[in-house]
Amino acid sequence: MLRWLTAGESHGPELIAVLEGLPAGVPVSPDAIRADLARRKLGYGRGSRMKFEQDALEVSGGVRHGLSLGSPVALRIGNSEWPKWVDLMSPEPIAAEKLAGARGAPLTRPRPGHADLAGMQKYGFDEARPVLERASARETAARVALGAVARSFLGELGITLVSHTLSIGPVRVPEDAVWPTPADVAALDADPLRCFDRATSARMVAEVDAAHKDGDTLGGVIEVLAYGLPPGLGSYVHWDRRLDAQLAAALMGIQAIKGVEVGDGFLTATRRGSEAHDELVAEDGAIVRQSGRAGGTEGGMSTGGVLRVRAGMKPIATVPRALRTIDVATSEAAPAHHQRSDVCAVPAAGVVAEAMVALVLANAVLEKFGGDSIGETARNLRGYLDAISQNLATERVSAPYA
């Protein structure tokens, strides 16, 4: 079983991430993790923080000479901006005069759409700073780092992932657009909005420009695809063991995500049954699904087809034009607190979603096949696939459906 935890605040000295349960012998490359951390900063419409904030990665446990040891993997991501926040975020008590000034002023105007007000109510804070520091999407850097390790584990078993942007605001790729594959990651990362359709990407850029001009923000939809999965990950026997339920929970746990669908999801709900499911045919001695409408899961289990999950991100709640709120120190109406923010962070959300899907799939693989070393896990996987009787055999799909 794979377990992961993160710790740290947005403007604290560092983020800490721990991954427990990873088998020994998995390649763990600090450079590969840094590359994913850089991908998390991609996207047209990002704020100034992405330009000056550096992620100083350090692998502090669980890895020796580039390979996992089977013990917990510990990662640290230093915050290059920490010197500016030493007093405000100090773990030690600080004299009031050291907190004087704009940066140290209490944040008593909770921002609509953020965790501010509910967090203040829940934890008994009289200002929003303690809430927003942990609720911030900065925390996702730690999960992206862990996801890079999980993806390396999956890659050793022939499982690969890719994410891309389906929509920004009202601008959406056509429903019949070609699915990207992991071979397209470089091209996607080079696109301003990580969109696989160039014409749609250009219209997305224009939409971001318009929102920026209006002092507004945008959300959108991203999609993660996983290729090469074996059938049978997850289970139908209990609700919490269903793979699609675990994926939905992981994606909903990403900041600003408000909806998740698997495969064609809500579109499937508009179809008749004769047009909603993936028919089975025999080809070259194997059972083949003619389409991928279900998104690679049936009955809470992977089918061996392409896994396809989507997540809808709401527009960023820190709106430059400032939404209305109440100053809880005076009980009077006031504009919400505004700090530098993005116009659109949907492309980055795709990278975070990719990491979360990788972690969930890695856990599902270990739950099914176990193994204290990557070699043992791989042997168990091969033995399982070999044991499936010939009349039930399906192919592990490593390319989009025709």
Swiss-Prot record:
Keywords: Amino-acid biosynthesis, Aromatic amino acid biosynthesis, FAD, Flavoprotein, FMN, Lyase, NADP
The keyword Kinase is assigned to this record: no
Pathway of action: Metabolic intermediate biosynthesis; chorismate biosynthesis; chorismate from D-erythrose 4-phosphate and phosphoenolpyruvate: step 7/7
Cofactor remark from the record: Reduced FMN (FMNH(2)).
Binding site for FMN: R134, A135, S136, Q255, A256, G299, K314, P315, I316, A317, T318, R340
GO biological process: amino acid biosynthetic process; aromatic amino acid family biosynthetic process; chorismate biosynthetic process
EC nos: 4.2.3.5
Catalysed reactions listed for this entry: 5-O-(1-carboxyvinyl)-3-phosphoshikimate = chorismate + phosphate
Ligand binding (NADP(+)): R40, R46
Keyword Flavoprotein (UniProt): yes
Cofactor(s) required for function per UniProt: FMNH2
One protein family per Pfam: Chorismate_synt
Listed NCBIfam families: aroC, PRK05382.1
Complexes and interactors: Homotetramer.
HAMAP family reported for this sequence: Chorismate_synth
Role summary: This reaction introduces a second double bond into the aromatic ring system.
Entry's family note: Belongs to the chorismate synthase family.
Protein name per the record: Chorismate synthase
Gene source species: Leifsonia xyli subsp. xyli (strain CTCB07)
